[in-house]
């Protein structure tokens, strides 16, 4: 999720990008077509091109029912979900946190250099200390890069790898031009009993998860729980600006302490539970993220008076290269270890709305190339879904020329890619060079990469350069089977089947995929088991407000998120 400058048009957040396919999922099921956003099982060995952590089921796709995993220490789960006094107290805690405007921009100073810029973060820290006294009495608090909060609840067995919970303290700005459109002031934290919503910026991204983790641990302390496994909370402060000051520093600090694969599992913000058909629910903790890369493409030519122009200015060359890129999108590459396949499987096996033909195509795809091709065709025809099975490209910025009668010496544009699971930064770079070479040869330009590595020598007209600006490989796939997954999935199953939904057995757990990136991108070397999940039932209309006007969160969803964190901590200690 990327921060937005105040007064500028809102930029689509990671959650906003996902609200589209979540909305589309429900509609697509109703009309009997295809839907996806998340998935389950890895591919058969002969089809998997990329290793994943752990061994997943490699046979017939099945959206099997997970056995609920209920701990013996379950003192307050029912209280969290159903007690009016706890509910009212929780509403107040979340509302008060939303009232503190911990806003970040795209670019932010180092906290030590400009503490006044972060004054509201210090206010939030004081609020935590006053609101959660047991945590601040019994847990060790360390501050990393001034504002990163690291809470450690020491377990009795130092040989056990710690459990790590993540969230971020920061929120995106509010566009001042939208203030009149807000139902309640954006930092009011207003609770509306008619809708059962808490309103305000950050209420659903992600002060809900932040406060849920605090509340769960505070309640465990009140209940007298004593962990044998250490519990760590790592709370960044600039996730909306890519986490370069917060999560990056925290991850480095934790790596020095615990080393490679030193953490049992990591839970951060992510997707939740969706009702994919009437009374059929699927939980989708995210176990993978696409990669990311930005390239700056420069057409470096010569200036002069516009009255004696060449056949093609640098702007013209840039335009044709952009056209070449956009006329040649990346191929669709779908394998069955793509997490989106699991939700398709759940729909095929449990939805009453999908046609038999659709179900046969989904379930038969691993065994029949023709059906796999048909499945890919269906996915690729859904505009909100196709980005999950290919590398995307978007030309987002372009600059060239300064005056009507002066030829532009240089034209530059930026192209952003979200990299498919089985691709890489190098593969994307090579492909971009291929098309740039075609244009360079066509118009007699040289070609270089990263400024000084010439593929074609510079000519009298100039040269084209492609420079890599920022890169992130696709995230490793975390397990969708095995002991760590079983405890996570079993906890989700128990909290929702037996608690939130009151014995509704049409509840399934699978995994999911993000096309954007969370703070977990800095934590890959700390654990093979990274899951992005908030224990709440997804409301489509609610998701439309993320990073936008009238952001809000439903109270029942917030309470279930607390219950999940509470029970997951206990289950990890009892069963891992």
Curated annotation (Swiss-Prot):
Known EC number: 3.4.17.4
Region (Disordered): 44-65
InterPro entries: ArgE/DapE_CS (IPR001261), Bact_exopeptidase_dim_dom (IPR036264), Pept_M20_carboxypep (IPR017141), Pept_M20A (IPR047177), Peptidase_M20 (IPR002933), Peptidase_M20_dimer (IPR011650)
Main localization of the protein described in the UniProt heading: membrane
Catalytic function, reaction form: Release of a C-terminal amino acid from a peptide in which glycine is the penultimate amino acid, e.g. Z-Gly-|-Leu
Membrane-spanning segments: 20-40
Gene Ontology BP terms: proteolysis involved in protein catabolic process
Protein name as annotated: Carboxypeptidase S
Source lineage: Eukaryota, Fungi, Dikarya, Ascomycota, Saccharomycotina
GN (gene name): CPS1
């Amino acid at each position: 999720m990327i921060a937005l400058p105040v007064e500028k048009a809102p930029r689509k957040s990671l959650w906003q990008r996902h609200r589209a396919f979540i909305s589309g999922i429900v509609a697509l099921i109703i009309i009997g077509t295809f839907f996806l956003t998340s998935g389950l099982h890895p591919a058969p060995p002969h089809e998997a091109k990329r290793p994943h952590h752990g061994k997943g089921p490699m046979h017939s796709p099945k959206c099997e029912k997970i056995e609920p995993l209920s701990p013996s220490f379950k003192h307050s789960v029912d209280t969290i979900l159903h007690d009016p006094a706890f509910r009212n107290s929780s509403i107040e805690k979340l509302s008060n946190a939303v009232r503190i405007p911990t806003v970040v921009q795209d670019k932010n100073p180092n906290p030590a250099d400009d503490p006044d810029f972060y004054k509201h973060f210090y206010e939030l820290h004081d609020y935590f200390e006053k609101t959660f006294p047991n945590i601040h009495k019994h847990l060790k608090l360390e501050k990393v890069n001034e504002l990163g909060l690291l809470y450690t609840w020491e377990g009795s067995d130092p040989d056990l790898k710690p459990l790590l919970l993540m969230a971020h303290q920061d929120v995106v700005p509010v566009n001042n031009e939208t203030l009149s459109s807000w139902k309640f002031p954006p930092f009011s934290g207003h609770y509306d009993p008619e809708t059962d919503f808490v309103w305000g910026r950050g209420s659903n991204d992600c002060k809900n998860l932040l406060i849920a983790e605090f509340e769960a641990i505070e309640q465990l302390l009140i209940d007298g729980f004593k962990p044998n496994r250490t519990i760590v909370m790592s709370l960044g402060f600039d996730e909306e600006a890519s986490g370069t000051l917060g999560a990056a520093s925290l991850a480095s600090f934790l790596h020095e302490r615990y080393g490679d694969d030193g953490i049992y599992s990591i839970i951060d913000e992510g997707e939740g539970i969706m009702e994919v058909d009437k009374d059929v629910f699927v939980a989708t903790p995210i176990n993978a993220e696409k990669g990311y890369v930005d390239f700056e493409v420069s057409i470096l030519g010569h200036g002069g008076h516009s009255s004696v122009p060449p056949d093609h200015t640098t702007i013209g060359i840039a335009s044709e290269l952009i056209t070449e890129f956009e006329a040649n999108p990346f191929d669709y590459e779908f394998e069955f270890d793509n997490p989106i396949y699991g939700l398709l499987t759940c729909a095929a096996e449990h939805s009453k709305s999908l046609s038999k033909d659709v179900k046969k195509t989904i379930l038969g795809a691993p065994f029949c190339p023709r059906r796999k091709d048909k499945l890919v065709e269906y996915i690729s025809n859904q505009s909100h879904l196709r980005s999950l099975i290919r590398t995307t490209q978007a030309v987002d910025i372009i600059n060239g020329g300064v005056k009507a009668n002066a030829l532009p010496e240089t034209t530059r544009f930026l192209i952003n890619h979200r990299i498919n699971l089985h691709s890489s930064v190098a593969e994307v770079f090579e492909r971009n060079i291929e098309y740039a070479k075609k244009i360079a040869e066509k118009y007699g330009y040289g070609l270089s990469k990263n400024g000084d590595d010439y593929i074609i020598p510079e000519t009298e007209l100039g040269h084209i350069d492609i420079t890599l600006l920022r890169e992130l490989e696709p995230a490793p796939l975390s397990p969708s089977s095995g002991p760590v997954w079983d405890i996570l999935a079993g906890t989700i199953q128990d909290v929702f089947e037996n608690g939130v939904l009151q014995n509704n057995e049409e509840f399934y757990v699978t995994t999911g995929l993000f096309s954007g990136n969370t703070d977990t991108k800095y934590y890959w070397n700390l654990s093979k088991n990274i899951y992005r999940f908030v224990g709440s039932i997804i409301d489509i209309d609610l998701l439309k407000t993320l990073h936008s006007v009238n952001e809000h969160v439903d109270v029942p969803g917030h309470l279930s998120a607390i219950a999940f964190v509470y029970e997951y901590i206990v289950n990890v200690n009892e069963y891992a």
